[in-house]
């Protein structure tokens, strides 16, 4: 498990995701030349209020992997 702390809208928040999801997120960030924090902020802005941020990140990574 990997715990990440990022600033979103001026406040710090943490997510916990499995190492495999973190590795995939790092690869996507490198390909897109974006920071992990920027990707997580985008995910946070577009998620519905029913899912927690860690789950939303996992789903985003999975959808991205299926797209490619």
Where are these regions (language model features)?
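Short Lys/Arg-rich basic patches
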Residues: 1-16
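Short acidic, gly/pro-rich beta-turn/loop elements at beta-sheet edges
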Residues: 16, 25, 67
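A general marker of short, structured functional hotspots
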Residues: 17-18, 56
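Surface-exposed, Lys/Arg-rich phosphate-binding patches that contact polyanionic backbones
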Residues: 20-32, 36-38, 42-45
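C-terminal structural segments of small proteins and small subunits
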Residues: 45-68
């Amino acid at each position: 498990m990997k715990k990440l702390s990022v600033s979103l809208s001026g406040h710090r928040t943490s997510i916990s995701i499995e190492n495999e999801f973190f590795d995939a997120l790092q690869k996507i960030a490198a390909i897109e030349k974006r920071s992990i924090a920027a990707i997580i902020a985008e995910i946070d802005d577009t998620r519905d209020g029913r899912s927690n941020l860690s789950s939303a990140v996992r789903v985003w990574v999975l959808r991205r992997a299926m797209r490619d």
